[in-house]
C-alpha cells in the first residue's frame, strides 16, 4: 500500500461524505417543502476536492510508464543468462548482421 | 545475392523495434486510470444531480482532463512511451462510458430518489 492508494481511498471517503451531506440536505428540503436545484457550496467543494484527489490517485497508482525503445537506458541488459555455454555466435545468421544498435 | 541482402537490410531497418511488454504495460496503465476516473465521474454526476446530456458533457470534460493528466505523466513526449499521440489522448475515451452511466444512475438513485 503506497501513497497513491491512500490518496484514492481518502478521495472516495470524501465523496462518500459529500453524498451523505447531500442526502441530509435533501431531507431538509423535504421538511421545508422546497425544490432541489443544486447541492450546497460545501458539498460542491467536497466534490471538487474528492475529484482532484481521485484524479491524482488515478494518475499515480496504476504504475509508471515504461520506455518502449530497446536502446533506452531503462531497457539495458545488465546481466547475461547463466547458461553461457549455449550462446553460440558462429552460425548461419552471421551472414545477415542485425541493424539494431543494442547497448549491452 | 547482393540485392536480396540489401532488400532484407532495408526491411529490417524500416520496421521500428518496440518493446511490446512495456507498450502493453503503458496501455494497461491508461485503461486502469480511465476506468477508475469514469467510475468517480459517475459518482460525482449522480451526487450533483445531473440529468440528460449535462451528464455526458461532464463525462467528456473529465475524460479530457484525464487526457491532459496522462500527457503530463508522459512528460509531454509520447514518443518515449507510445507509438502515437492518439494512444495517450483518445485511447479508451469511450470505453468507460458504460461504467459512467452505471455509477451515475446508482449514485443518483441513492442520493436523490431513495
Curated annotation (Swiss-Prot), chain A:
SUBUNIT field: Component of the ER membrane protein complex (EMC).
Superkingdom of this protein's organism: Eukaryota
Topology of this chain in the membrane: Multi-pass membrane protein
GO CC term (a single one): endoplasmic reticulum
UniProt name for this protein: Membrane magnesium transporter
UniProt-listed InterPro entries: MMgT
Membrane topology (Cytoplasmic): 1-2, 62-104
Membrane-side (Lumenal) residue stretches: 24-40
Organism for this UniProt entry: Arabidopsis thaliana
Classification via Pfam families: MMgT (PF10270)
Family: Belongs to the membrane magnesium transporter (TC 1.A.67) family.
PANTHER family: ER MEMBRANE PROTEIN COMPLEX SUBUNIT 5, PTHR21181
Function per UniProt: Mediates Mg(2+) transport.
Keywords tagged on the record: Endoplasmic reticulum, Endosome, Golgi apparatus, Membrane, Transmembrane, Transmembrane helix
Compartments in which it is found: Endoplasmic reticulum membrane; Golgi apparatus membrane; Early endosome membrane
Transmembrane stretches, start-end: 3-23, 41-61
Keyword Endoplasmic reticulum among record annotations: yes
